[in-house]
Amino acid sequence: MTDAPTPEALTNEPAQASSLPSLAITGASGNVGGTTARLLSERGLPLRLLANTPSRAPELPGAVAVKCSYEDTLTTRSALEGVDVLFMVSAPESEDRLAKHIAFVDAAAASGVRHIVYLSFMNAAPDATFTLARTHFHTEEHIKASGMTYTFLRDNFYADFFVELPDEEGRILGPAGDGRVGVVAREDAGRVAAGVLADPGRYEN
């Protein structure tokens, strides 16, 4: 039985990527990605945690952190060498968010990733009122055309994020009109992602 990597094994050296676990997780230092990584680690699955700053990735049994940046194609391709299944958490909101997503998806396909699980958004569409849902739609379309098999997890707004939104008068301002929303806990989103990643072939879209 091989010993699990120690914290000292955390690395940002892409040259070692080919010998690392074939299940890769982005966003592991965040809420959904962190929950996903923890639950998969508890199942005994070896993980490759992709992070801009590997030292910020959680220290989990069987997990190794590797430096990876969505916009840095060369670093991404090295980090994804030998990866079979990839969990892609969307990049932080920015003007070039879609460009980062496209670059990352292209690098994943070029690196030989077989299956990608993408954390998308409910009702992703090119004309969505919620502008970020448009980015998710175009990311989904690019993944579909990439040649990789895929699973799209379409979350709604996070319940534990809503408490951070009200202004000083208790209002949440946004382009929703009289619309309603069905929220989801980030912990639950992570549990679903972990279940899919543990058996991705069962959930191909």
Model features per residue range: what roles?
Residues 2-56, 71-74, 81-83, 92-99, ...:
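Oxidoreductase cofactor-interface core, primarily capturing Rossmann-like NAD(P)-dependent enzymes
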